[in-house]
Amino acid sequence: MKTAFIFGLGYVGLSLAQALAKKGWQIRGTTRTPSKLKGKIGIGWEILPFVADVPLANPKKVFADVDVIISTINAIDGSDPVLDLHGKDLENFSGWAGYVSATSVYPDMPDSICYEDTPVAPATNRGKARVLAESRWQNQLGAEVFRAAGIY
C-alpha cells in the first residue's frame, strides 16, 4: 500500500487525502487543529498536530515508508515552515514531492491573462514568499508546483 504525507489537511489537503484514500492510499498528515477533522477522515489515518514553530515529534518515524509528500502550508513571514523545521529530515527523501502554491506569484496584470509559463513577478509580500518557498521545494525535493487560484 502506498503512503502519502500531506502537510496541511485543510481545504485542498483534505480533499486530496480523501481522493487518495478512496484509491487505497494510506494517509498521514498534519493540521493545526486535529479536532476539526472529526468525521472527515478515514479509518487508519495518522493525523499529527503541526504549528509553524514546533517540529513534528519523531520525524524519522513519521516520514518512514512515505511515497509522496505534499505541502499545502502557506509561507509564513517570508519562509516555508515545513522546510524550516524538517528540511534536514527530508534530505534523503526519494519519493514524489508536491507543493501547492498560489497565483499570487504572478505579476499584477489586470488587463491581461497569466499562463503557467508567465514569468513570476509577485506584487505582494505573500507572493514573494511563495516564490521563495516554491524554489526551496523544487531545489531540495524536486517538487512539482501547483498554483491554486482564488483560495490561497
Task: Report residues per predicted region.
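N-terminal Rossmann-fold NAD(P) dinucleotide-binding loop
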Residues: 13-14
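Aromatic pocket-lining residues of Rossmann-like dinucleotide-binding sites
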Residues: 20
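Conserved beta-loop-beta element that borders a ligand/cofactor-binding pocket
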Residues: 135-152
